[in-house]
Amino acid sequence: MASLCFQSPSKPISYFQPKSNPSPPLFAKVSVFRCRASVQTLVAVEPEPVFVSVKTFAPATVANLGPGFDFLGCAVDGLGDHVTLRVDPSVRAGEVSISEITGTTTKLSTNPLRNCAGIAAIATMKMLGIRSVGLSLDLHKGLPLGSGLGSSAASAAAAAVAVNEIFGRKLGSDQLVLAGLESEAKVSGYHADNIAPAIMGGFVLIRNYEPLDLKPLRFPSDKDLFFVLVSPDFEAPTKKMRAALPTEIPMVHHVWNSSQAAALVAAVLEGDAVMLGKALSSDKIVEPTRAPLIPGMEAVKKAALEAGAFGCTISGAGPTAVAVIDSEEKGQVIGEKMVEAFWKVGHLKSVASVKKLDNVGARLVNSVSR
């Protein structure tokens, strides 16, 4: 369960195809991935719904994990989004209607073609070949937008799994990730380091996109691993943070980051939280360009390490900072120091929590049979 570490004082100072870039910079997604994102029907016979309604949950995620930019991510326990999906005769067959959005934000569009959950739901329905049933969807946001915790991926994952469940679980996790990528391509780019762990749980390595090749990395269950998540009151839009990425990198930095990403994978498989933290904290390519855009981030990382964290970096595109430790009690102390640094140096109020790894991923919470 999550533990609130410390809260700083109040009053501080689908089917949308992104346009391809004829000359993509080093860190841009290759346009061929984007133009081939549209999903295809995978089920020969249209399945009938086995439930009248379902409720699903998908967890928050930490993408990049330092040197694993766009190809490593993990799910964290206790934070995420819920989707309630119903068979609705008033909705046109083969379509989805978003009835309600509640939670941390209500400013999201209820147009399913402009909503992460809606796009993923439509993509999943297309994969299943659903043409004779209409669905209505309620989205409860447990994650704020632009937090660096995979908010869009959580919505997409919960929606994709909800559609799959209501029609009898005909699709596998890799196929659901593809459906979720339809949504991610619209919001933040065609990369799976949030949506894959949101659906599959645990750590996930994205080895390839054409074809999609996902490698679950299992952290040993008998080893302790905790994430200290500190989210400041500051929005870091993914598109803005991606625009800050360098277009060229020195070969020595490429070699360094590659070795640290390999060390991080080894640390996960061995259950070595210390090495995991060191590798996570070692990025020389992405973090140095993004940290200056988040007030106080460099001081927050320093405070985390001085307080005993094994490592600290930016979660996803930020602004959330993530530190790694092997004890919940130590994590609470580290979180307090990180919050203080955000306040003193960045003049930002923030909230810290200590979370375990979520090894389950998106799942069914409850259902009503026909």
Curated annotation (Swiss-Prot):
Q: What is its main location?
A: plastid
Please state what is observed when this gene is inactivated.
Answer: No visible phenotype under normal growth conditions, but mutant plant accumulate homoserine and show reduced susceptibility to the downy mildew pathogen Hyaloperonospora parasitica.
Record pathway = Amino-acid biosynthesis; L-threonine biosynthesis; L-threonine from L-aspartate: step 4/5
Specify whether Iron-sulfur is a keyword of the entry: no
Q: Which UniProt keywords apply?
A: Amino-acid biosynthesis, ATP-binding, Chloroplast, Kinase, Nucleotide-binding, Plant defense, Plastid, Threonine biosynthesis, Transferase, Transit peptide
Catalysis: reaction(s) = L-homoserine + ATP = O-phospho-L-homoserine + ADP + H(+)
**TM regions (residue ranges):** none
InterPro entries, per this entry?
Answer: GHMP_kinase_C_dom, GHMP_kinase_C_sf, GHMP_kinase_N_dom, GHMP_knse_ATP-bd_CS, Homoserine_kinase, Ribosomal_Su5_D2-typ_SF, Ribsml_uS5_D2-typ_fold_subgr
EC number per UniProt: 2.7.1.39
| One GO molecular-function entry | ATP binding
Tell me which residues form the transit peptide. 1-34
Consequence of changing G180D: In dmr1-5; loss of function
Chain sites annotated for binding ATP? L143, P144, L145, G146, S147, G148, L149, G150, S151, S152, A153, A154
- Resulting phenotype, G118R: In dmr1-6; loss of function
What cellular component terms from Gene Ontology apply here?
chloroplast; chloroplast stroma
Tell me where in or outside the cell this protein is found: Plastid, Chloroplast stroma
> NCBIfam families, from UniProt?
PRK01212.1-4, thrB
Functional summary from the UniProt entry: Catalyzes the ATP-dependent phosphorylation of L-homoserine to L-homoserine phosphate. Is specific for L-homoserine and cannot use other substrates such D-serine, L-serine, D-threonine and L-threonine, galactose or D-homoserine in vitro. Required for susceptibility to the downy mildew pathogen Hyaloperonospora parasitica.
Checking PANTHER family in the record gives:
HOMOSERINE KINASE (PTHR20861:SF1), HOMOSERINE/4-DIPHOSPHOCYTIDYL-2-C-METHYL-D-ERYTHRITOL KINASE (PTHR20861)
The name this protein goes by in its record? Homoserine kinase
